[in-house]
């Protein structure tokens, strides 16, 4: 997904 809860996703994330 695109949330800050996903460590594999680094960059613009939805807090």
UniProtKB/Swiss-Prot annotation:
The keyword Secreted applies. The record marks 14-15 as: Reactive bond for trypsin. Keywords: Disulfide bond, Ion channel impairing toxin, Nematocyst, Protease inhibitor, Secreted, Serine protease inhibitor, Toxin. Its main location: secreted. It is found in: Secreted; Nematocyst. It comes from the Eukaryota. GO terms for molecular function: ion channel regulator activity; serine-type endopeptidase inhibitor activity; toxin activity. Signal peptide: none annotated. Coiled coil: none annotated. One of its GO terms (cellular component) is extracellular region. This recombinant serine protease inhibitor inhibits both trypsin (Ki=2.5 nM) and chymotrypsin (Ki=30 nM). It may also inhibit the TRPV1 receptor, a receptor of the pain pathway. In vivo, shows anti-histamine activity, since it dose-dependently weakens the clinical manifestation of the allergic reaction induced by histamine injection. In vivo, does not show toxicity to mice by intraperitoneal injection. A synonymy between H.magnifica and R.crispa is controversial. Belongs to the venom Kunitz-type family. Sea anemone type 2 potassium channel toxin subfamily. This is PI-stichotoxin-Hcr2l. It comes from Radianthus crispa (Leathery sea anemone).
